[in-house]
Amino acid sequence: MQKKTPDYDNVFKTMKMKHKRLFVPVINDVFDRNYPKDVKVDILSSEGYLTETETADGSKDIEEQISDFLIKIENEIYLLECQSYDDGSMAIRIAEYAFIVARQFASWDIGHATIPMPRFSIIYVKRTERTPKATMITFTFPDGQTVDYKSDNVILEDFTKEKVVEKRLFPYIPFYIAKYEKEIASEGNIENVIEELVYFREEMIRLHQAGELSDDELIDLKGFVNTIITHITNGNKNEERLVNIMGGTVIETESDKIKIRTIIEMGQEVGLEDSEILKKLQEKIIGLPLTRAKAYLEQYGKQLV
């Protein structure tokens, strides 16, 4: 079973809610569209469904599956899924998501219904020997008719850092270093990682100065990068060095500090271990490195009676 990567999901979902306009160039690139940057983007409710899966001990577990990113631009519906690994279930999950979406926008009358299927694509953060180039769902009907519902997948390893910036594919930047996961996690040679992080930092600053990225977008993108770094390093010696490239932690506002203190106080009140509190801090505060989380725990935890 592939390991779950909630940090990747959290970054993707936080980005879509806070900075949906950054996804317009992604939609243009993936689906060969030409929407202007200021086009209206509607985030649609990601209605979930329940599915039964088998756990390691053979028992059954019920999980709710919710699509990553469902948006409407003009009259088109787009479904994007961010995936770190292909676990063999993506095609059927896309089919299930697509039918849920189609039902919301279906039209019908006596004896007839029209069910519009959304355009979809899967964004693979990492490439393995099992990563497919495309996803295809084949519908078969009793009369022998078959219809293929197909889309090319996005594999981030196929993009150069220059292409990401040239096409303004900002949502890809936080996940770009995932291809170096082995080197980063094993404390191997990370010079290539450093070079690419410096490149992205300088380009984001340049585009911010040119007015293409807002203050919040720049700060959050750097924070998202640091979240992925801390996920991969898991506190090893590479963490501080890599996080500092993006300018260290982005937690500077009083509201963020109040939120951090609240998480620590509530965690200690219910008897959570320090490791659990640290995990919650990094889940709730995008871009907070483990070293800073520990410092906040020491600072605010000492004040409790």
Question: What do these predicted regions represent?
Answer:
Residues A98, A102-F105, E181, I229-T233:
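Short amphipathic alpha-helical signal-transduction/dimerization elements
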Residues Q2, K72-S84, I184-V305:
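Short, charged alpha-helical interaction segments and adjacent helix-coil junctions
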Residues H19-L22, Y180, N238, Y300:
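Residue-level recognition of alpha-helix termini/interfacial anchor residues
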Residues M1-P171, V305:
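Accessory alpha/beta interaction modules
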